[in-house]
């Protein structure tokens, strides 16, 4: 009997890459591969890459240098190792990757993962194995589905891609060029994926897409469904305790999405809503197609639907031409909104984007100083948000055992880690926890009950269950 071949995948970047990595594992599992945590022991190493920032793509080439040594060592011991570069760097740079790193055997863009077995076979025959086209077929219809055992091993929370690509063309962003135009999966296929996950014990579904609330998939009635309508359908699936979605664009928040937050108890009151800047001048230069006031109105609409809703966001400091006045407008917006969490980055020019050719670059010193000021404000808001949980009872979905013996960790509705002393038989349940204290970014508390309440009926309005 031929021993299974070993596969190691290292992913960089977004949630979509995490999901894509899992689907590559499933697809290659059908070809006889099993995962290994040791790249040096692998027959195939895949780097699933991110192209959003320069540092992320340069990390890939540093890693390829290390893998070249591992590949040479494997060859000396009589073992063939293949190296594949996947993801957005693969899509953007294509053949340039093999020019810079000849040790690479396969280059495959994010829309072609279902062709990996054929590409690996081509490489084994010494043929060129590069695919960075946007094929007409839907890759999701060809990717292997995970086994029940694989789903269980990945935990009680899972990602499901519902949408890929972006048509917004923000001037700083490579996504429209690396992921292509917006494409939405049919509702029926999404529902099938979610049902397979919940049948295997998954309790939290996160619907993901580069611009997820631009979702416009074909419904079972033959009509185009929006994300809001899709959320109602997902909430009907038995076993779904929690629903999330990411990442959103303010311009695609419609009444149906707001209504889903109002009506569906399964939809978590936590929205990742990137804004990037609080300066209208910079927002225009970014081609965001909304103002700071437009963004505030979207936030107000969400808060009108649920008063317990909280937000996270993304911010870029040092965009070309950003002045101190522009930056202060961003700080003012953060003050006005009040975030539970946020992610901040220094502007990084990406080749091929309009912003890369803009003049008036902000100095590295100014970027560092602004990033520190912005992050300090975000950290203080996050600390205040977490501190406000002390003394309250919050629902926690328990996910796994913690590092401390006898302790479990789960997530609140706002994705805060929550730790309690409890037995592992409550993993997968949503239980009330009284929060007693904080430890850095984690909440510490005690179970109030050890029996989970029934998952609410689908689309049950919040008002009908009290509170």
UniProtKB/Swiss-Prot annotation:
Going by the UniProt record, its keywords in alphabetical order are: 4Fe-4S, Cytoplasm, Iron, Iron-sulfur, Metal-binding, S-adenosyl-L-methionine, Transferase, tRNA processing
Q: Which residues form the Radical SAM core domain?
A: 152-384
InterPro entries the record matches: Elp3/MiaA/NifB-like_rSAM, Methylthiotransferase, Methylthiotransferase_CS, Methylthiotransferase_N, Methylthiotransferase_N_sf, MiaB_methiolase, rSAM, rSAM_horseshoe
* Localization per Swiss-Prot or TrEMBL: Cytoplasm
Which annotated residues bind [4Fe-4S] cluster 2?
A: 166, 170, 173
Domain MTTase N-terminal intervals: 5-125
* Keyword Ubl conjugation carried by entry: no
The coenzyme or cofactor needed here is: [4Fe-4S] cluster
**CDD domains this protein is in?**
Radical_SAM
EC no.?
2.8.4.3
**Residues reported to bind [4Fe-4S] cluster 1:** 14, 50, 88
Q: Which GO terms describe its cellular component?
A: cytosol
The catalytic activity, as recorded, is: N(6)-dimethylallyladenosine(37) in tRNA + (sulfur carrier)-SH + AH2 + 2 S-adenosyl-L-methionine = 2-methylsulfanyl-N(6)-dimethylallyladenosine(37) in tRNA + (sulfur carrier)-H + 5'-deoxyadenosine + L-methionine + A + S-adenosyl-L-homocysteine + 2 H(+)
Record-level Gene Ontology MF annotations: 4 iron, 4 sulfur cluster binding; metal ion binding; N6-isopentenyladenosine methylthiotransferase activity
Q: Which PROSITE patterns match?
A: MTTASE_N (PS51449), MTTASE_RADICAL (PS01278), RADICAL_SAM (PS51918), TRAM (PS50926)
How is the cofactor bound, in the record's words?
Answer: Binds 2 [4Fe-4S] clusters. One cluster is coordinated with 3 cysteines and an exchangeable S-adenosyl-L-methionine.
Q: What SUPFAM superfamilies does this protein's entry cite?
A: Radical SAM enzymes (SSF102114)
Signal peptide (from-to): none
Question: Top EC class per UniProt?
Answer: transferase
HAMAP family, per the entry: tRNA_metthiotr_MiaB
What family does this belong to? Belongs to the methylthiotransferase family. MiaB subfamily.
Q: What is known about what this protein does?
A: Catalyzes the methylthiolation of N6-(dimethylallyl)adenosine (i(6)A), leading to the formation of 2-methylthio-N6-(dimethylallyl)adenosine (ms(2)i(6)A) at position 37 in tRNAs that read codons beginning with uridine.
Subunit-structure text: Monomer.
PANTHER family cross-referenced by the UniProt entry: CDK5 REGULATORY SUBUNIT-ASSOCIATED PROTEIN 1, MITOCHONDRIAL TRNA METHYLTHIOTRANSFERASE CDK5RAP1
Protein name in UniProt = tRNA-2-methylthio-N(6)-dimethylallyladenosine synthase
Which source organism?
Bradyrhizobium sp. (strain ORS 278)
Question: What taxonomic lineage is listed for the species of origin?
Answer: Bacteria, Pseudomonadati, Pseudomonadota, Alphaproteobacteria, Hyphomicrobiales
